[in-house]
Structure formats: C-alpha cells, structure tokens
Amino acid sequence: MLEFEMDMDQLAQIKVIGVGGGGSNAVNRMIENGLQGVDFISVNTDAQALHLSKAEVKLQLGGKLTRGLGAGANPEIGKKAAEESREQIEEALQGADMVFITAGMGGGTGTGAAPVIAEVAKEIGALTVGVVTRPFTFEGRKRSTQAAAGIAALKEKVDTLIVIPNDRLLEIVDKNTPMLEAFREADNVLRQGVQGISDLIATPGLINLDFADVKTIMKDKGSALMGIGIATGENRAGEAAKKAISSPLLETSLDGAQGVLMNITGGSNLSLYEVHEAAEIVSAASDAEVNMIFGSVINEDLKDEIVVTVIATGFDDAENRRAQQQSNFNRQAAPKQPLKSKEKEAEKKEPRFTSQPEADDNESLDTLDIPAFLRNRRRKSR
C-alpha cells in the first residue's frame, strides 16, 4: 500500500478573529463546539473581557488609547484603537489564506475595529470574509444606526460580508426564550456561519472542497446571505434543505445569487442519496446560471441530525445589472414625461374647464402656453 506524507504547510490556513464582546463570545462558542482546522484570535479594547476568551491568541487593542477599559460603545475609539495596534494585528494574521472576521455590530470595538482588521487581512493577501450580526431592535436606535455605518464600512473592506439580522432570530426561538439565551443564539448563528464554510475545507468528509472552490464563490462578491436547516427522521435531508432555503435568516430568495456554497453535515450514517437529495432541492431553488458548489462533512456528534448550511453570494452583481437595466429604460422613456406633466399641471390649475369641447382641448395641446390660454378664455366668458 502506498503512503504519502502530507506537508501541513500546504493546507489552506484559516484564521478566525473575534472582534469585541460579540465576536469574542462567538469565538468561544466555536471552540466549545470543537471547530477544527482553524486558528482562533480574540481582540478587544476591554482587557477584562479579553481575559475570559478561550482563543489561543489574545490581542488587546489600543492599550495607550483605552488603557484596557473598552471603547465605551464609541466606534471611533474602536477604529483608533485598531489603528494603534495595526502592526500586532498584521503579525497575528500573517500566513493566513483565509480570514473570518466575526463581530456583533453596533457597539464600539466590533463596529469600529472590524473594518481596519479586514483591511489588514486583505493587505496580506487573505480571502477575507465578514460574519457579523445586526443588533436587535430593542437594543435602541443609536446602536442600530452605528451598526448600519459599521456594516457599510466593513463591506468595502472584505471579499464577502454575511450579515445576520438578530431580529430574525426571534422567528426561530420560542417567544418565552430568556434574553440571555437569545444573545447566545446570535453567537451560535455566527459560529454556524463560520463553521459551515471552514468545515468544507478543513474537515474530512464524503465530498470535500478545496480552497480554490471556496475562493471562486467568495472573492470580491460583496453581500452574502446565510440559511441554516436542521432536521431528523426519515426525510431529514430534504426537510433540512427546505428549511435552509426558507430560513428566516435569508432576507431574500436565492434567485438573485451569482454563487451558492452548500454544506451538508451529518453523522456517520449520512448517505450519498441524502446528500444528492438535499443538493437537488437547493439547486432547484437557485438561478439556472448560478455557480453552485457543495460539500459534505461527517460529524460523529450529530447522530440522527442533518445540518444544511447555504451561503448565497454575488447579490451586488445582480443588483447592479438590474439598476443598469432600469436606468436604460428610464432614459428611453424620458422624452414623453414633460408633456404629461404639463397636462397634469393644467388640469390641477383649472379644474372647472374640463367640460370644454374636445377640439378645443386638442388645439390647446399644440400650444406651449396652456395656462395663459385657459386664463384668456375665462376672462371672455365673464
């Protein structure tokens, strides 16, 4: 039997960096769930919170600026702290082929520092993917506004950005779920987003993908959406796939996506037929021209469960094409607009003259000075 030595340096190196409180919590959740084949980094301006992180590498941002006391929910301080620690961030990310940046948007550190970290990751040549949450509505308008600005800034710096709207989690969890549990669920969804992609590259399975496959779907693709489906029982594969494509986390249908990455994870009893069934359902829901890649991973802990994760990318390309088509259509229709607006303006100004004979109306349309003409007739009738 032939044996080959595998050089571990040749495998794609994946690093997950949790930024701020929400990001660090998500990293802890990934470590607890035994996420394999990735290196974990936790960064924060809050030294006390950083101490609770389970990541192998911990980095305090902006030691001089914040003195380890946090960013005070101010994204500008988070940004400056990351700029101060830029060299240390680069050192921590060095050697990575792929970097996941995970954060809860709306606070100070995650919102302000994540775009700076993404910029550094891109500079070292890594495929950079952001997986972040948008805050719950009950967290307040200010946090929501800060999150929107942070998401816009981060989108400019990453290859692909997956935004998980926390409000959508309320459609998944029971209405009696305690608030702390709801926040834990948000961390868990961040974990599933990262694991759904990284497992395809780093974990042995029935159908493996290489790093180049994932890069094709995710490089320079802008906005992305994620759907997760979990099912057990006789028709578990089909049900999990249907749940994934109709997941509340997907804010739109898969139709507009240019690329779809799919992960089917099950226990040792996962069959090839089940993988085929799930892939067929997701493929049928996608655009005919979509670039779809899928893989399957074995996780002994799942036993009877199947988890289907769908990442849909390239919505920005489709939106740009639609906008261009609409713009072309508007330009063609433009010459007809002024006449209609003048007619409406005349009708609004002189509503009592609508009963004039049709011939008069047609004559008046040939003149440009409609209001004056109507005013003259009004004087004569008096």
Curated annotation (Swiss-Prot):
Major localization listed first in the record, in broad terms: cytoplasm
Annotated disulfide bonds: none
Positions with biased composition (Basic and acidic residues): 340-352
Keyword list, A-Z: Cell cycle, Cell division, Cytoplasm, GTP-binding, Nucleotide-binding, Septation
Binding positions for GTP per the UniProt entry: 21-25, 108-110, 139, 143, 187
SMART domains named in the record: Tubulin, Tubulin_C
Localization per record: Cytoplasm
Pfam families: FtsZ_C (PF12327), Tubulin (PF00091)
Cellular component GO terms, alphabetical: cell division site; cytoplasm
GO molecular function terms attached to this record: GTP binding; GTPase activity
UniProt keyword Cell division present: yes
Cell division listed as a keyword: yes
Region of interest called Disordered, as start-end residue ranges on this chain: 322-382
GO biological processes: division septum assembly; FtsZ-dependent cytokinesis; protein polymerization
Role summary: Essential cell division protein that forms a contractile ring structure (Z ring) at the future cell division site. The regulation of the ring assembly controls the timing and the location of cell division. One of the functions of the FtsZ ring is to recruit other cell division proteins to the septum to produce a new cell wall between the dividing cells. Binds GTP and shows GTPase activity.
Record text on subunit structure and interactions: Homodimer. Polymerizes to form a dynamic ring structure in a strictly GTP-dependent manner. Interacts directly with several other division proteins.
PANTHER family membership: CELL DIVISION PROTEIN FTSZ-RELATED (PTHR30314), MITOCHONDRIAL DIVISION PROTEIN FSZA (PTHR30314:SF3)
HAMAP family in the cross-refs: FtsZ
Protein family (similarity comment): Belongs to the FtsZ family.
Protein name (record): Cell division protein FtsZ
Organism lineage string: Bacteria, Bacillati, Bacillota, Bacilli, Bacillales
Name of the gene: ftsZ
